[in-house]
């Protein structure tokens, strides 16, 4: 117990004092400055090594003392890391410059388009006879010439379409007339055929009148009469007209 109390009394003042804050400024004493440089340099190199191992980072550390002596550390290569740094800085600067250039270009193009839209709107109003107060005599004459030229083109196009429509209607009329003549001819031909058929039916020798005028043939009883053809003689003998033989 006495040993622990004595140890506590010895350690407690150190805990109370702790490590004081060091003012960050140039050390005037050359010896102290050199000693501090060596300590801090070794600690910095150690931290760089730990960072590269623990975090798998590419680290390059370059330190020059006040006497010009070089101290360096790199887990890969100082030169390769510096080249990579230069390339990254160049890419970022180029990206920024390209973005700025694009923004300026689009702004200029937008301004040009707005100006063109404004001019076209003014010209449209002038063509409609509006916003003529600020125009000079020469501008009004030019506007009049443009309007007359436009009207001439419009009339020419209108007449072209009108003539094409008239030509189409004339052609359509001819086609309808031809179709009408063809139908009339077919109707007349049909009427003539019907009239001829009616006349043939009314003639005495027509088949219909023949059936009406000629009585039907007489019916014979086959039990009492024989056909003449069955009793006809041969062609080598003279033919004799005989009445049909009646069987009793």
From Swiss-Prot:
Q: Which residues form the MADS-box domain?
A: 19-73
Instruction: Say if the entry is tagged with keyword Transferase.
Output: no
As one GO molecular function, the record gives:
RNA polymerase II cis-regulatory region sequence-specific DNA binding
Which residue ranges does the record assign to the K-box domain?
103-193
Query: Which residue ranges traverse the bilayer?
Result: none
Major localization listed first in the record, in broad terms: nucleus
Is this entry keyworded Metal-binding?
no
Pfam families, A to Z: K-box, SRF-TF
GO BP annotations, alphabetical order: positive regulation of transcription by RNA polymerase II; regulation of transcription by RNA polymerase II
Q: Where in the cell is it found?
A: Nucleus
Under SUPFAM superfamilies, the record lists: SRF-like
Can you name this protein? Answer: Floral homeotic protein AGAMOUS
Q: Which source organism does the UniProt entry give?
A: Solanum lycopersicum (Tomato)
What is the gene name? AG1
């Amino acid at each position: 117990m006495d040993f622990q109390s004595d140890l506590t009394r010895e350690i407690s003042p150190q805990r109370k004092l702790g490590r004081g804050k060091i003012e960050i400024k140039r050390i005037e004493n050359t010896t102290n400055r050199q000693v501090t440089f060596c300590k801090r340099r070794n600690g910095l190199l150690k931290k760089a090594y730990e960072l590269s191992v623990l975090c798998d980072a590419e680290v390059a550390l370059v330190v020059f003392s006040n006497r010009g002596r070089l101290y360096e550390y790199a887990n890969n290569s100082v030169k390769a890391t510096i080249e990579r740094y230069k390339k990254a800085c160049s890419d970022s600067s180029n990206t920024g410059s390209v973005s700025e250039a694009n923004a300026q270009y689009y702004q200029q193009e937008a301004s040009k388009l707005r100006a063109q839209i404004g001019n076209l709107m003014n010209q449209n109003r002038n063509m409609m006879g509006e916003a003529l107060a600020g125009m000079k005599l020469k501008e009004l004459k030019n506007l009049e010439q443009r309007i007359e030229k436009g009207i001439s083109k419009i009339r020419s196009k209108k007449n072209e379409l009108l003539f094409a429509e008239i030509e189409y209607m004339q052609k359509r009329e001819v086609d309808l007339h031809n179709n009408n003549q063809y139908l009339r001819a077919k109707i007349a031909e049909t009427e003539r055929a019907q009239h001829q058929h009616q006349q043939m039916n009314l003639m005495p020798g027509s088949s219909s009148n023949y059936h009406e005028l000629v009585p039907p043939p007489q019916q014979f009883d086959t039990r009492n009469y024989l056909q003449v053809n069955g009793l006809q003689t041969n062609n080598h003998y003279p033919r004799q007209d005989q009445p049909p033989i009646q069987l009793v």
